[in-house]
């Protein structure tokens, strides 16, 4: 594989691991010319459905867009990159399992929100506020109240 830093063709695999969800192989590589290290991922290439946007246009499913939107919602939150990758892999699996050739962007947004809900409550609220186009504070309060009803009361932490 070509080095992304110096473009040299000779790189060695230093470490290989199966990702958390088993859907990819993570490889650490070292360039023999510049000695820099980088990470690559090996995944099975599958035919994911086209995304039908609200205006009716169609676009190819882009994993990078899902990862980027989740990373934005999770910015400065204590969630590992591997957890994001695993969540995106679950979304892809759900899309593949439908067998459909198209998925509405609204459905895709709901899948992302479901994954964020399991990863981080704050990220879920951030994403929901943009995705559902919150217009006032009461909509934030509604989502927070929904979480309070869904989870049992927690005892306050001692400081």
Swiss-Prot record:
A Pfam family it matches: ATP-cone
Keyword Kinase found: no
Textual note on the cofactor: Binds 1 zinc ion.
Keywords: ATP-binding, DNA-binding, Metal-binding, Nucleotide-binding, Repressor, Transcription, Transcription regulation, Zinc, Zinc-finger
InterPro entries tied to this protein: ATP-cone_dom (IPR005144), NrdR-like_N (IPR055173), RNR_NrdR-like (IPR003796)
Coiled-coil ranges (or none): none
Domain ATP-cone residues, every copy: 49-139
UniProt cofactor(s): Zn(2+)
One GO BP: negative regulation of DNA-templated transcription
Chain positions of all zinc fingers (unnamed): 3-34
UniProt-recorded Gene Ontology molecular function terms: ATP binding; DNA binding; zinc ion binding
Disulphide connectivity of cysteines: none
Function recorded in the entry: Negatively regulates transcription of bacterial ribonucleotide reductase nrd genes and operons by binding to NrdR-boxes.
HAMAP family: NrdR (MF_00440)
Recorded family membership: Belongs to the NrdR family.
Protein name: Transcriptional repressor NrdR
């Amino acid at each position: 594989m070509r080095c992304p830093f110096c473009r040299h063709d000779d790189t060695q695999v230093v470490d290989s691991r199966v990702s958390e969800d088993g859907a990819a192989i993570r490889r650490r590589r070292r360039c023999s010319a510049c000695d820099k290290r980088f990470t690559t991922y090996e995944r099975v290439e599958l035919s994911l459905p086209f995304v039908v946007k609200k205006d009716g246009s169609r676009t190819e499913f882009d994993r990078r867009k899902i990862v980027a939107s989740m990373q934005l919602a999770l910015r400065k939150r204590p969630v590992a990159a591997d957890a994001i990758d695993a969540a995106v892999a679950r979304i892809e699996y759900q899309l593949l399992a439908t067998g459909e050739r198209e998925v509405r962007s609204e459905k895709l947004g709901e899948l992302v929100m479901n994954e964020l809900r399991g990863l981080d409550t704050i990220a879920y609220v951030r994403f929901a506020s943009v995705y559902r186009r919150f217009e006032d504070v009461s909509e934030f309060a509604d989502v927070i109240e929904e979480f309070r009803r869904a989870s049992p009361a927690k005892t306050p932490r001692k400081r």
